[in-house]
């Protein structure tokens, strides 16, 4: 549907900073008995692109519902509102929901690529904090239930990159959704990882570092295009 031909690629790059401790965890215990280690590649902590994609998709869904868009159930694609079930019922008339058209789903590829983000110039610090498990009934600590949480210290800068493929100016609602999630990132309204309820994971895209470029196909090669799109020029306003 959106990949039959090639139209353009929009590349957004910049720097992202964690304003509060960031703990995107592996879910397994690390060697050395850290209870909740953060994710790493070759020893370097990073922000998985999938983590940011999930957070932004949730925000995009909230926005889409607020403007009256019906959203597919991607958690249960065979359920009554699931994409696979809707496609089966509507057949040739089926069109994926606006969120699936941007972020992908069971029947369509994502048009947005989120890249893993690593600390700029390899500069970062990690720390441990000790927490205690609280009994929800007694509201008192549970004896013997201390645990350690590893996190990336606030102020770490990450290399941010995303790409949008085959985006056209006339897709006004899709453009509004993209502007909304980019604005949320710039305003620091997105949180990632664990312990968000106690303030962990707040991130911000630094507006003065953001660069937006559009590339189109010319003579078999990707060539940077002069930005005339009101969507692209207004993306950071």
Question: What residue spans do the PLM features occupy?
Answer:
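RNA-binding basic/glycine-rich loop and surface signature characteristic of RAMP-family CRISPR effectors
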Residues: 1-237
């Amino acid at each position: 549907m959106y990949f039959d031909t090639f139209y353009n690629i929009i590349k957004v790059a910049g720097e992202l900073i964690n304003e509060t401790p960031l703990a995107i965890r592996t879910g397994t215990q690390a060697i050395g008995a850290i209870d909740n280690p953060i994710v790493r590649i070759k020893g370097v902590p990073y922000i998985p692109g999938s983590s940011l994609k999930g957070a932004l998709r949730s925000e995009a869904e909230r926005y889409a519902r607020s403007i009256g868009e019906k959203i597919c159930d991607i958690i249960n694609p065979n359920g009554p509102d699931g994409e696979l079930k809707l496609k089966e019922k509507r057949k040739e008339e089926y069109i994926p929901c606006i969120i699936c058209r941007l972020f992908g789903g069971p029947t369509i590829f994502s048009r947005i690529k989120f890249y893993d983000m690593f600390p700029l110039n390899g500069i970062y610090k990690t720390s441990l904090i000790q927490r205690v498990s609280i009994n929800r009934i007694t509201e008192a600590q549970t004896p013997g239930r201390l645990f350690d949480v590893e996190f990336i210290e606030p102020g770490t800068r990450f290399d941010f990159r995303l790409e949008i493929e085959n985006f056209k100016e006339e897709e006004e609602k899709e453009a509004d959704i993209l502007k909304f999630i980019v604005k949320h990132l710039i305003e620091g309204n997105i949180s990632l990882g664990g312990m968000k309820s106690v303030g962990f994971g707040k991130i911000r895209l630094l507006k003065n570092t953001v660069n937006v470029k559009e590339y189109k196909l010319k003579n078999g090669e990707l060539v940077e295009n002069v930005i005339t799109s009101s969507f692209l020029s207004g993306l950071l306003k």
